[in-house]
């Protein structure tokens, strides 16, 4: 039992900085929304529309690069640190290629925005302007993620946290300058948020690169000291590992976007209640998401050391800690749901609906925690293809259709409205949690030679 407590301490030591980094990232989005809203409601709406297109695109690239973390962790655990620099260099090449693809998509996002039903022309113009400013930050963001994944693969999660807060602190004054036009800069309104955020991503990358080059613990890993051409074999391996993660993230983000669209015709009260519950549950999701990143590092490191038993200890401890955190957040949600809803809105009908939906959110928090930590475990085992199939099946084959039937039809029960979609979330996330755990057990029961051979690829 002692080894599980020791492992839990190590996991939390890795996870807490990741949690704080996520908080900083979320706060940046909050600052953009508030400061754009202070300029005008139209600019705030433009930032919201632009962000809804930016997030799926950039998270696809982010997911692709997550493959680097278990690769670096495994090489570090096996004592092959001399090979890490080559993997990271190829990670930068991959980030560059994906950045170009994302920038092309975002530059042409005007076609998506203009096709929206009854959208105001001025709003559409501002949303396109915001995206065309923000897209120049895509390379900076993805390069930052490569450097961050290198650090996290080496069990250094604090640098990502520090750079996240540097980005947040820089974002506020730069937003002010470009939104309102100070110090000789043009007054851009909501578009200025895009300029500021793009600039901040490059600042975060430059700061992280400076830290990596200065850190004593990484002096033997010199990624920038020699140029290396794209290595097709390494790039293909990173894509093979990262593409299923990227697609899983994309399907998860688009699921919630589709549900938001399906809820929108139900009326202002339903939309507001749904959005409040979704926003709060997203904040709670930061805890298991960060723990999943820590579990990936620990499992990858243990497999690199050649110890499948210790990898199992890391995996089981991660699930146990995740369930404990989820029970705590679920109890907090149940007890404080009305007070939480009142922080967002004081309309009694909205508060009542949001409180009811948060009760359903509390139910699925345990499943959500298990499934996301299970995904982190499978990343550590480099079994990323399963993540894609499980996520797609749970969300799009089971969760969304069942939610649609419960929310908008009378086929099973009388129409439940937004609560039906949240029941669908419970079905989807619980299914994902069960399948993730079954897959984990299947992998762990394989002979050690097969597990270590897969991890070493």
From Swiss-Prot:
Claim: Kinase is one of the keywords in the record: no
Gene Ontology terms describing biological process: sodium ion transport; xenobiotic transmembrane transport
**GO CC terms in record:** plasma membrane
Q: How does it sit in the membrane?
A: Multi-pass membrane protein
Keywords, alphabetical: Antiport, Cell inner membrane, Cell membrane, Ion transport, Membrane, Sodium, Sodium transport, Transmembrane, Transmembrane helix, Transport
Q: InterPro entries of this UniProt entry?
A: MATE_fam, MATE_MdtK, MdtK-like, Multidrug-R_MdtK
What highest taxon heads this organism's lineage?
Bacteria
> A single Gene Ontology molecular function, please?
antiporter activity
Q: What residue intervals traverse the membrane?
A: 11-31, 53-73, 93-113, 127-147, 160-180, 191-211, 243-263, 276-296, 316-336, 350-370, 387-407, 418-438
Where is this protein found? Answer: Cell inner membrane
Annotated function = Multidrug efflux pump that functions probably as a Na(+)/drug antiporter.
Per the similarity annotation, which family is this? Belongs to the multi antimicrobial extrusion (MATE) (TC 2.A.66.1) family. MdtK subfamily.
Which PANTHER family does the UniProt entry name for this protein? FMN_FAD EXPORTER YEEO-RELATED (PTHR43298:SF2), MULTIDRUG RESISTANCE PROTEIN NORM-RELATED (PTHR43298)
| NCBIfam families associated with the record | matE
What is the protein's name according to its record?
A: Multidrug resistance protein MdtK
Native source species: Klebsiella pneumoniae (strain 342)
């Amino acid at each position: 039992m002692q080894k599980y407590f020791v492992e839990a301490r190590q996991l939390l030591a890795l996870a807490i900085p990741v949690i704080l980094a996520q908080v900083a990232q979320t706060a940046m989005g909050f600052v953009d929304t508030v400061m754009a809203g202070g300029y005008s409601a139209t600019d705030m709406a433009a930032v919201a529309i632009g962000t809804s297109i930016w997030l799926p695109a950039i998270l696809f690239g982010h997911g692709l690069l997550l493959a680097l973390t278990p690769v670096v962790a495994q090489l570090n655990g096996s004592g092959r640190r001399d090979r890490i620099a080559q993997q990271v260099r190829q990670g930068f090449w991959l980030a560059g290629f994906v950045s170009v693809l994302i920038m092309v998509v975002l530059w042409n996002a005007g076609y998506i925005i203009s096709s929206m039903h009854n959208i105001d022309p001025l709003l559409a113009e501002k949303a396109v302007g915001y995206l065309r400013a923000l897209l120049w930050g895509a390379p900076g963001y993805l390069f930052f993620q490569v450097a961050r994944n290198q650090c996290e693969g080496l069990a250094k999660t604090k640098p990502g946290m520090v750079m996240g807060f540097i980005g947040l602190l820089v974002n506020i004054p730069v937003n002010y300058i470009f939104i309102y036009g100070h110090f000789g800069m043009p007054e851009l309104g909501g578009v200025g948020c895009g300029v500021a955020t793009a600039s901040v991503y490059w600042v975060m990358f430059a700061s992280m690169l400076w830290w990596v080059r200065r850190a004593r613990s990484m002096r033997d890993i010199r990624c920038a000291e020699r140029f290396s051409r794209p290595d097709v074999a390494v790039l293909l391996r990173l894509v093979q590992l990262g593409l299923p993660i990227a697609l899983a993230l994309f399907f998860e983000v688009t699921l919630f976007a589709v549900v938001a669209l399906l809820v929108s015709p139900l009326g202002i009260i339903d939309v507001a209640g749904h959005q409040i519950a979704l926003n709060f549950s997203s904040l709670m999701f930061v805890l298991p998401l960060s723990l999943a990143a820590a579990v990936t590092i620990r499992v990858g490191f243990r497999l690199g050391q050649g110890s499948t038993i210790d990898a199992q200890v890391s995996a089981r401890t991660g699930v146990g800690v995740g369930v404990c955190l989820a029970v705590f957040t679920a109890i907090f949600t149940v007890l404080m749901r009305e007070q939480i809803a009142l922080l967002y809105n004081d309309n009694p009908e909205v508060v009542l609906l949001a409180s009811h939906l948060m009760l359903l959110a509390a139910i699925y928090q345990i499943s959500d925690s298990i499934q996301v930590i299970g995904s982190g475990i499978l990343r550590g085992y480099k079994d990323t293809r399963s993540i894609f199939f499980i996520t797609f099946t749970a969300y799009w084959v089971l969760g969304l259709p069942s939610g649609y039937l419960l929310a908008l039809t009378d086929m099973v029960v009388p129409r439940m409205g937004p609560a039906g979609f949240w029941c669908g979330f419970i079905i989807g996330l619980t299914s994902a949690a069960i399948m993730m755990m079954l897959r984990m057990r299947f992998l762990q029961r394989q002979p050690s030679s097969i597990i270590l051979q897969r991890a070493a690829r």
